[in-house]
Amino acid sequence: MVTNTSGKKKTAVARATVSDGEGRVRINSQPVELVEPEMARLKMLEPFRISGSDLRGDVDIDIDVAGGGFAGQADAVRTAIARGLVEHYGDAELRDAFREFDRSLLVNDVRQRESKKWGGPGARARYQKSYR
């Protein structure tokens, strides 16, 4: 059985394909073990730590991720993996475990960066004003 899921965070979008296999996890056709920095890799593999690593040996997960930076991509990937595992196994207990740990494992974080406006260096900050 093949399951397609996706995850989003900021401008990063991850599309995951979960299929029966022997535990390979690939990010952009590269083994997840080669992902740097390590913090991003650990974030991506959180769903396996919560579910128990026995699930990882039964499935192959191929993920294509684009957009954003490494932190946003890591969050998008972990959402895609968690959704894929829940959908692939159809396990309500697994879904509840993910939801209890962190709701963003199953639900996309829709917050976006506020755009810069004129009259200042950022969205809310204004340029310094001088009276003399």
UniProtKB/Swiss-Prot annotation:
* Record flagged with keyword Lipoprotein: no
This entry carries the following GO cellular component terms, namely: cytosolic small ribosomal subunit
Q: Which UniProt keywords apply?
A: Ribonucleoprotein, Ribosomal protein
Gene3D superfamilies assigned to the protein according to its UniProt record, in alphabetical order = 3.30.230.10
- One Pfam family in the UniProt entry: Ribosomal_S9
Q: Which Gene Ontology BP terms does the record give?
A: maturation of SSU-rRNA from tricistronic rRNA transcript (SSU-rRNA, 5.8S rRNA, LSU-rRNA); translation
One GO molecular function term of this record is: RNA binding
Member of which family?
A: Belongs to the universal ribosomal protein uS9 family.
The name under which this protein is listed is: Small ribosomal subunit protein uS9
According to its UniProt entry, this protein's organism is Halobacterium salinarum (strain ATCC 700922 / JCM 11081 / NRC-1) (Halobacterium halobium)
